[in-house]
Amino acid sequence: LGGGNHFIEIQEDENGMACIMLHSGSRMFGNMIGQYFNKIAHEMNDKYFSTVPSEYNLPFLPVDTDEGQRYLNWMNLAMDFAFENREVMLEKVKHIFTEQVEKYTGITPNYSDEINCHHNYAALENHYGESVWVHRKGAAEGEVAIIPGSMGSNSYIVRGMGKAESFLTSSHGAGRNYSRTGAKEKFSVESVMVDLRQRNVVLGKTSKKDVAEECRF
């Protein structure tokens, strides 16, 4: 599953239906791919005399080079890994959920369609009549997407409206008012836990020391 803002959550929608939502990705596998090719991109930008200042940490990989094609292949593999990772975890959660519901209610739950969307990737798309690479970081293609809320706040299933200005993209999260460090400095563990209890949120997390990082404040 991973740490940080990754989670598995049982929710209730506006119609009183139970929902399972989880957030995870390619884990260290994807991170290592990104770091490896980011280093290569820095070296290539020095070679090509890139006009982008190195302190911006935005080196590029020309897609018509061997290095660029290798990155695309590895990125797609990481995306496939992330997709399957979420699928496997969701199946395990559904299995446990079904067992417990049947045990305590005698009812076998039925599951509706699933939504599984990527949120860190690049894709070749057509916008404004041009073929361009769209980089989505913490964002999702705005068809049917998921916007998870902070702990104790609402999450949303959304359908894109086809806004060209956003390159047909939706956000993939609630955003932040504070950095993780800033949130821990401003809000105590106790205050976050009191807020969650008041909102009838059960947090099944052994260590609570970092809960302020993802609180709704």
Q: What kind of feature is each model-predicted range?
A:
Residues 1-217:
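Domain-length cofactor-binding catalytic modules of enzymes
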